[in-house]
């Protein structure tokens, strides 16, 4: 049975084992098969194992096809490629991620892009990345807001100044998001719900 056939089996546990085997015994011929499966694999655990298997291969071989996937029209292909690039952590992926994918209209892709950008940004780009991400404060639902806050917190201290600036925004939602993020910077273990609650309390009563 080929790797492609093994990854197409109906049993999720069998697909998981196939991905694990591909990472345990890396082979350059597996790379396009693993990447193609990332685009359509429905099971989260299997997708994580596909990422692990790709990370086990040399970055010089995986980076080019993963970067190509960032231009896919399929959102899962983009998000999985970003997730894998974040695990590889190679700065060579930076130009392909920022800034375009940071503003992806698909929230899952955007959230993964923020995390990947933090993981691969060269030191000289971190302050600029923080400034770019800060323009997105106020976006999305609870999970989106929390993901953006965690990304900005991971960029501290480079993100401190821009967060303090945005915390004075005339837009209440943006201001709360910035204030809550500053709380996460100060205490990464604070629950996001608590950070947002305390940030709202800090707003002046209108």
Model-derived regions, located:
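HEAT/HEAT-like alpha-solenoid repeats
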Residues: 30-31, 75-76, 129-133, 193-205
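Acidic carboxylate motifs that coordinate Ca2+ or other divalent cations, activating on Asp/Glu
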Residues: 106
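Structural detector for internal amphipathic alpha-helices that build alpha-solenoid repeat scaffolds
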Residues: 5, 12-27, 36-37, 45-60, ...
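Eukaryotic acidic, Ser/Thr-rich intrinsically disordered low-complexity regions
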Residues: 164-206
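Strongly charged, low-complexity linkers/loops
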Residues: 127-146, 154
């Amino acid at each position: 049975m080929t790797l492609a056939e093994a990854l197409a089996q109906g049993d999720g546990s069998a697909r998981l084992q196939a991905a694990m085997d591909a990472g345990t015994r890396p082979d350059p011929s597996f790379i396009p098969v693993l990447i193609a499966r990332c685009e359509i694999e429905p099971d989260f655990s299997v997708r994580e194992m596909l990422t692990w298997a790709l990370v086990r291969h040399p970055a010089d071989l995986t980076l080019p096809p993963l970067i190509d996937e960032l231009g896919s029209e399929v959102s899962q292909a983009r998000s999985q490629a970003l997730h894998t690039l974040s695990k590889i952590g190679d700065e060579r992926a930076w130009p392909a991620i920022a800034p375009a994918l940071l503003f992806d209209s698909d929230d899952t892709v955007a959230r993964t892009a923020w995390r990947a950008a933090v993981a691969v940004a060269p030191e000289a780009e971190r302050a600029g990345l923080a400034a770019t991400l800060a323009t997105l404060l106020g976006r999305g639902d609870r999970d989106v807001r929390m993901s953006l806050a965690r990304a900005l917190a991971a960029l501290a201290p480079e993100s401190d100044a821009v967060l303090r600036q945005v915390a004075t925004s005339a837009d209440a939602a943006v201001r709360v998001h910035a204030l809550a993020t500053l709380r996460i910077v100060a205490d990464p273990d604070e629950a996001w719900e608590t950070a947002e609650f305390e940030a709202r309390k800090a707003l002046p009563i209108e």
